[in-house]
A protein has these predicted regions:
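N-terminal Sec-pathway targeting helices
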Residues: 2-14
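Feature of secretome-associated and extracellular-like proteins
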Residues: 11, 99-200
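Beta-strand-rich domain onsets/edges
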Residues: 17-48, 54-56, 164-200
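Short consensus segments that form the blades of beta-propeller domains
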Residues: 28, 66-69, 96-100
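A short, structured loop/turn motif at beta-sheet edges
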Residues: 42-49, 79-83, 111-115, 156-159
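A short acidic/small-residue loop/turn micro-motif
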Residues: 47, 55-56, 93-95, 124
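Short, acidic Ser/Thr/Gly-rich low-complexity loop/linker segments typical of extracellular
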Residues: 61-91
Length: 200
């Protein structure tokens, strides 16, 4: 009986030790990125200079990373060069907290007179067979962190389209972590005769 109890105690100790190791190992993504891309006019294919690119990372908390909601974790912004190129640095996104996970980045791209970004030729493959579309999307994201991906911006043609696009904000990001993006949005709002976004 004592031998059985000793084995049981040893088994419980082993299981608890494994659980402790798992709990205190870093969780979430490892280093990800960098992200490289070129932004072009969807209609003409010509590069777009001066587009603001904002990358945002969020932290999910709670059991299974779902019950506690999410909050801002980090951001980086840059502006495209004369050839439309941009670069976002790699990130270490692990955390010691087993009940949180860093995810992202989500990309916000703004250039006055243009709409929301998409991967090049998305209209040709993105609305086809769901499995084909999903695989192509994964391939584009892999390319984004390898040789670089081409992103398209559609040119807006009406004031109403520009008004809708001017509300394209990363509201979860503090103003001091997206000054270029906020400046570009506020210039667009001013050109439309509207009040600027107040920093928070």
């Amino acid at each position: 009986m004592k031998k059985t109890e000793r084995r049981l105690a040893a088994g419980v100790t082993l299981i608890l030790s494994i659980l402790l190791v798992v709990l205190f190992l870093p969780t979430g993504s490892k280093a990800a990125g960098p992200w490289k891309g070129q932004i072009v006019n969807k209609e003409t294919g010509k590069p777009i200079e001066g587009a603001v690119v904002l990358a945002v990372w969020m932290k999910a908390t709670g059991i299974f990373h779902t019950t506690g909601g999410s909050e801002f974790y980090d951001s980086e912004e840059t502006v495209t060069d004369a050839e439309g190129h941009f670069f976002i640095h790699a990130r270490q996104t692990w955390t010691l907290n087993p009940f949180s996970r860093i995810y992202g980045p989500e990309f916000y791209i703004f250039k006055s007179g243009y709409g929301r970004w998409q991967f090049r030729d998305f209209d040709k493959w993105g609305l086809k067979d769901a499995m084909v579309s999903a695989e192509r999307t994964r391939a584009e994201w892999r390319r984004f962190t390898a040789e670089g991906s081409v992103l398209e911006l559609p040119q807006l043609k009406t004031r109403e389209e520009r008004l809708r696009m001017s509300s394209y904000m990363a509201y979860q990001v503090p103003a001091n972590r997206m000054p270029k993006f906020l400046e570009a949005i506020n210039k667009e709002l001013a050109s439309l005769g509207l009040q600027p976004v107040e920093p928070r």
